[in-house]
UniProtKB/Swiss-Prot annotation:
Name of the gene this protein is made from: Z
Record motif PTAP/PSAP motif, residues: 93-96
Post-translational modification: Myristoylation is required for the role of RING finger protein Z in assembly and budding.
Pfam families xrefs: zf-P11
InterPro entries per UniProt: RING_finger_Z_arenaviridae, Z_RING-type_Znf_sf, Z_RING_Znf
Family assignment from sequence similarity: Belongs to the arenaviridae Z protein family.
Compartments where found: Virion; Host cytoplasm, Host perinuclear region; Host cell membrane
Keywords, ordered alphabetically: Host cell membrane, Host cytoplasm, Host membrane, Host-virus interaction, Lipoprotein, Membrane, Metal-binding, Myristate, Viral budding, Viral budding via the host ESCRT complexes, Viral release from host cell, Virion, Zinc, Zinc-finger
Domain remark text: Late-budding domains (L domains) are short sequence motifs essential for viral particle budding. They recruit proteins of the host ESCRT machinery (Endosomal Sorting Complex Required for Transport) or ESCRT-associated proteins.
Membrane topology: Lipid-anchor
Protein name (Swiss-Prot/TrEMBL): RING finger protein Z
GO molecular function annotations of the record: RNA binding; zinc ion binding
Length: 100
């Protein structure tokens, strides 16, 4: 009766991918701004922050400005696109790999 397939348990990585795929707007947190041809990226709203940036369509915004904008509406004041509501924090090593 019904479906005889058993449900397999998802690993932590598969669960994270499933939850990331199910959300609408997902952004990756940039701890350090990546240099470009024209210099470093800064927050397009306050122009001061160059760490902990979130990419919004074609520009970067800092966490402080993102929180302020999300308090007002779900759309960006600069580009008019929907603001990211989920942030994926990449795991970065805190020390260099051990030498053999």
């Amino acid at each position: 009766m019904g479906n005889s397939k058993s449900k397999s348990k998802l690993s932590a990585n598969q669960y994270e991918q499933q939850t990331v795929n199910s959300t609408k707007q997902v952004a990756i947190l940039k701890r350090q701004a990546e240099p470009s041809l024209y210099g470093r990226h800064n927050c397009r709203c306050c122009w001061f922050a160059n760490t902990n940036l979130i990419k919004c369509s074609d520009h970067y915004i800092c966490l402080k400005c993102l929180n302020i904008m999300l308090g007002k509406s779900s759309f960006c004041d600069i580009c008019g696109e929907e603001l990211p509501t989920s942030i994926v924090v990449p795991i970065e090593p805190s020390a260099p790999p051990p030498e053999d």
